Amino acid sequence: MAHLRLQLVVMIIVILAAAAAWGTPAPLSVAFYYADNPPVNELKAFDIVVVDPDHSLNPASYGDGPSRLFAYVSVGEADPQRISTNKMDPAWLIGDNKAWKSRVVDVSNPEWRQFFLDKVVEPLWQAGYRGFFLDTLDSYHLAASKEALPAMQAGLVETIRAIRKRHPEARLILNRGFEIFERIKGDVFAVAAESLFHNFNPATGQYGSVTEEDRQWLLSRLSEVQKSGVPVIAIDYVPPGNRSLTRQTAAKIKALGITPWVSDKALSGLGVGRLEVMPRVILGLYDGAEGDGDAFFTNLQRYAVMPLNYLGYSVKLHDLSTPLPAEILAGRYAGVVVWANSGQSGEKQDLKKWTLRCITEEVPIVFLERFGFPLDSEFAAGLGLELTPFNRLAPPARVVSKDAIFGFEQQPLPNIETFLPMKLKSGTPLLQLASANGITSDAAAITPWGGYVYGKYVLTQLLESQAAWVVDPFRFFKQALRLPDMPIPDTTTENGLRLLLSHVDGDGFESRAEWRGGRLAAEELKNSILDRYKIPVTISLITSSLAPDGLYPKKSAQLEGIARGILALPWVEGASHSFSHPFRWKPDQSDTGIEAESWHTVKVPNYTFNLDAEISGSLNYINERLMPPGKRTRIFQWTGNCLPGEDALRLAYQADALNINGGSTLISTSNLTVTEVAPLGISRGPWFQVFAPNQNENVYTNLWSGNFYGYSRIIETFQLTDSPRRLKPVNIYYHFYSATKEASLNALRRAYDWAMAQPLFSIYTSEYIEKVLDFNRTVIARDDDSWLVRNNGKLRELRIPRESGYPDLTAGSNIAGFTDNNDNRYLHLGPGGEARVRLTSSVPAAPYIETSGAYLDAFERTPAGLQMITRGYVPFEVKIGNGQGCRLITPSAPVLPGASDTTSIKLPEGSHALAVSCQ
């Protein structure tokens, strides 16, 4: 069998060399977006994105990948608003385009051509653009005489050839230019044309339909281009409020074999092309007056975001006291959730009027507890509601009928104080109440525009700090927001196994164990935990505790030596837990009481709090003085209340540091509610704070004041966040001071022992953070009967309901396999950051990875079976579905015959080539 193993190694090398070339290339997809505030993640679904370079998007910020930016360039017209126009010789401007308020250029002028190449194209090339959309190629017809037309056309030909001569690798898309196409077709990447079915007339400001005569003329021109082997693109214009027509128009263009893009008149929205992006962002509107002005403490962030994350959506938080988004909503947002703090929260920014925008653009909107504005009869009627006049409401209120969606964790308890007499005229009622004198209220409903739960029937407060859901948030959000059935990016699992990560906060590093002969906590932790459980672990340090100019200068050499020994362990990655362990990260925070006393800021002599010193300074110290050769830290673990402001987060990102901590996942058998499961994190401006999946021993021991064995209850949290829904990975998270007491150390051992007995996939904390960030970046686009999935390749697991079917495993899908857990089917993606998901009712016959506790660094389907390179940090097992009769071959392990439908192989930690041969 030696020759088989040698052949395997050779084939794996081939896989790695061609890792980016899996599958048959799909037809070209193109998007056009000319406005500010572009939806970057969503645009990356398209192979080519044409942007206005004067706006905020550029190649440097866009990054590498299969999606490329093309720069919009007006050739035949000069826009007075652009800087380059002001530098033009007035003699080059020979007329006006009154409809678009621009000047027509003499494209036959050699001096203009040189200016255009040097001052327009060249700066864009230097900025990183390698593709250009050349617009206004036909504008010379507006100003040139008939006799001048040949010279104008020759000038355009020379200009296009000059671009390619200067930059042979430049890709050019022409907007029309049919009269010159034959002369320059060898220099053209694609040809576009506007208004095949629907147009926009700038003179009248009206959208309209294209006549059949005009359409046939344009189709004949495009057909001539296609015969030359050059792709063609049709750009049509539809009102942004008519998403259905947008979708239908794109489908009609696509059916003609033409690449479509259908959007609004200004190309300022996320339209529909060959692909339709399935938006994965929910806009969450909250009242900035709630939670002492910090969105972290709002009901929206604390309770609604986690279920929306589970359903596959990130949430963009927006304060109702600030101007509401003015950009086109359709295509950008999957829906809107409003959780106002009062009946007047939305009046300042006219939430009522903005709600009508959502309805017009067919973006579902949900209201929780209240609408955020006074609901008058006229507006209620527009929402399909009828307010019932009444003289008085006689208590008590009672439940007349309720859908099974209610009573999720607590039953609804009618309250006459929040009773709003109204009847649903259009939609599906979910909860109907009645007063003692017979007045009714449809307190919750699914409506044509979304849905609402009015009053105290969203959740109920059990105790001062405990809440429970009354409505099932998973089902309600799914139904009310019309969330489509599609693959869901999952941060809890990879290759079918639940993830395991561990990270340690630096508190107590220098403390001494309390038993006789006890050493420093750091030494005890290394001896009792780190050397025993050799799984990936992230160790953070409070640098003022170790530094020569810190708290313990006389002990610094000893403490630094211990830290170096820990960080040198192969399974340890380093992190910073700040310089002085700030309890508060924002100057306006005023935390008091036992938490502030327990999580204090270290008082370092002669030190004044400084964000740079806390973040980049502490990271630099660890890298320069403590990390071994070949290892660097780029992780920052928040301290204290773990509520960094936007400035602190910005500095962490600018230091190229991944960040984690915060959140509050404390679900247990004595606190059995998913309100105690935190979301993935929180957005603060453009920055994202990643929450720890689970909480540390501090909160299981009453802030380290007693019950020091309390961390053993983390096992309850692990179990309850795995079933009936897998909401979190397993995260063993603790402080160095757990090694100072026998009870806490035993609790820690128990948590580790439990984890070691489970089939888990061990990863580093940095890798989990990157998966969460990739969750936010992942774009999913519908392409006929399949979904295109793209991201940075850090998140590689998707989830679908079991009843949705099975993934098509044919070559080109980049789906390595699947496995079932609870009611879901988990799909495992290969490397590369791109996959195509097509579902079928048929069980696959080909072999596939059922589960694996290791990364896939390379993966390919072959006529004989599978080839892959796997890499694990601990010994792991690979299980192959449909493996009966197949052989598993590795260069370092024996050939194992398949004896059942599931064939498996156990491998030591490290990287391994593996082939599955079924012939």
Please describe what each predicted stretch is:
Residues G76, L463-W571, E614, L619-N641:
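Active-site beta->alpha N-cap acidic-glycine motif
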Residues S268, F367, W754, P759-Q919:
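Non-catalytic C-terminal accessory domains or segments of carbohydrate-active enzymes
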Residues G95-S108, E361, L368, G372-E378, ...:
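Metal-dependent polysaccharide deacetylase catalytic core of the NodB/CE4 family, i.e.
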Residues Q226-P239, L483-A513, L530, F609-D612, ...:
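Catalytic grooves of carbohydrate-active enzymes
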Residues Y33-D47, D54, G293-L375, D505, ...:
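Helical hinge/lid and interdomain linker segments adjacent to catalytic or ligand-binding clefts
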Residues V277-M278, Y310, Y333, V363-P364, ...:
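A glycine-centered loop/beta-turn motif at secondary-structure junctions
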Residues T259-E276, S314-S321, A480-E494, E524, ...:
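C-terminal domain-boundary segment and adjacent tail
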Residues Q344-P412:
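A glycine-rich, often tryptophan-bearing local segment used as a flexible ligand/cofactor-contacting loop or short
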